[in-house]
């Protein structure tokens, strides 16, 4: 049985941890792109950015492999919130989100090399942040969790103290809708879940 390599085009420790928890073998590959898209519809926006990340990462891979990328945003009243640039922006984002519903979108993209077969999909989850005093927002920012997070919060950390409820896929809010991803990998690319491991057709997935 031969081997197939999987590359994750993401620097997110949350996405890495989610895949590691599944015993899914992968390597990290850089995908430095400007995270901007001309798409206005949130679902198309995240799928476009996820595909751009996967495409950029694929440029440096010269072997048979599968490349996975993802992009997550928060949308409230039609406005897209990305990652805060500074404390003031983080405070503004959390102030906007508190006491109301917003939607988390994550786009996923998969490219099979060398033939460049690709597929994209997305997941959305509704999230309600409880009402927060300014002191609560400042305390949360002081935890340091808001950086590098769409919408300036992390649901799996201290952010669990400010989230009132969710409707939909929890892991999507963390940053990677794993059920949606593995459905795509199986349906479009032949990656199978076998016991406590995974296979690609007649090949073993390996680092």
Curated annotation (Swiss-Prot):
- Write down the InterPro entries for this protein, in alphabetical order: ITPase-like_fam (IPR029001), Maf-like (IPR003697)
HAMAP family in the record, alphabetically?
Maf
* Reactions accelerated catalytically: dTTP + H2O = dTMP + diphosphate + H(+); UTP + H2O = UMP + diphosphate + H(+)
* Described purpose of this protein according to its UniProt entry: Nucleoside triphosphate pyrophosphatase that hydrolyzes dTTP and UTP. May have a dual role in cell division arrest and in preventing the incorporation of modified nucleotides into cellular nucleic acids.
Domain of life assignment: Bacteria
- Protein name (database record): dTTP/UTP pyrophosphatase
From the Swiss-Prot or TrEMBL record, state where the protein is found.
Answer: Cytoplasm
A cellular component term, taken from the record's GO annotations:
cytoplasm
Please give the family membership noted in the entry: Belongs to the Maf family. YhdE subfamily.
Coiled-coil intervals, chain numbering: none
Q: Which CDD domains match?
A: Maf
């Amino acid at each position: 049985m031969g081997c197939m390599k999987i590359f994750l085009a993401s620097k997110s420790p949350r996405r890495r941890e989610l895949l590691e928890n599944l015993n899914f073998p992968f390597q990290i590959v850089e995908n430095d792109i400007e995270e901007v898209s001309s798409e206005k519809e949130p679902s198309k926006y995240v799928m476009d950015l996820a595909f751009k990340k996967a495409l950029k990462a694929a440029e440096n891979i010269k072997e048979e492999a599968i490349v996975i990328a993802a992009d997550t945003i928060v949308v409230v009243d039609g406005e897209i919130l990305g990652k805060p640039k500074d404390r003031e922006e983080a405070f503004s984002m959390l102030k906007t989100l508190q006491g109301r519903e917003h939607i988390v979108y994550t786009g996923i993209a998969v490219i099979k090399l060398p033939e460049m077969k690709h597929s994209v999909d997305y997941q959305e989850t509704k999230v309600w942040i409880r009402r927060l005093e300014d002191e609560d927002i400042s305390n949360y920012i002081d935890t340091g969790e808001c950086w590098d997070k769409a919408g300036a919060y992390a649901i799996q950390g201290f952010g669990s103290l400010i989230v009132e409820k969710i409707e939909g896929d929890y892991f999507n809010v963390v940053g990677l809708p794993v059920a949606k991803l593995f459905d795509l990998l199986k349906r479009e690319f032949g990656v199978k879940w076998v016991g406590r491991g995974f296979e690609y057709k007649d090949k073993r997935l390996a680092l």
